[in-house]
Regions:
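Iron-sulfur-associated redox domains of electron-transfer enzymes in respiratory
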Residues: 1-148
Length: 148
């Protein structure tokens, strides 16, 4: 077994994609992944920016039209088995970006939640969700990774 295969087998590699929003969820995702308080590296959860090395795709924010194709390409580049986490209310249901009412009307700049673009395995609601909730959501996605 080569070095790359060994590393992939013995760790979970998470890739984070920020689509559109206030960045509150992005901060909490990074707190969950990189903060010494949670220290996920001790559990072999590592951050990657290469979709070919990722096992878990973490998406935050409502998806604008400009991100549809890039998000699909990233998803397709991640090898099986893979899990997708939609983190935050914007990623889960579109939140204020798609649910505008009154004089403002419907926002035509956004597609909506992540599941309208790619399949989502775990939804972590909240504005912004706590790092503990993000970690719990990631744990719920682990069984799918173990299927292969």
């Amino acid at each position: 077994m080569g070095l790359k295969a060994t590393a992939r087998k013995n760790a979970i590699h998470a890739m984070v994609v920020y689509t559109e929003g206030c960045n509150g969820c992005d901060i909490e995702v990074l707190n969950a992944l990189l903060s010494p308080r949670y220290d996920l590296e001790q559990y072999r959860v590592l951050l990657t920016w290469n979709p070919r090395e990722a096992d878990v795709l973490i998406v935050s924010g409502c998806v604008p039209w400009q991100m549809v194709e890039p998000l699909k390409k990233i998803y397709e580049m991640i090898p099986e088995p893979k899990a997708v986490l939609a983190v935050g209310s914007c990623a889960v249901n579109g939140n204020v970006f798609t649910n505008m009412v009154g004089d403002i009307g419907i926002n035509e700049e956004v597609v909506g939640p992540v599941e309208k673009v790619i399949p989502v395995d775990v939804k972590v609601p909240g504005c912004a969700p706590r790092p503990e909730d993000i970690i719990a959501g990631a744990v719920r996605g682990v069984p799918k990774l173990m299927e292969a």
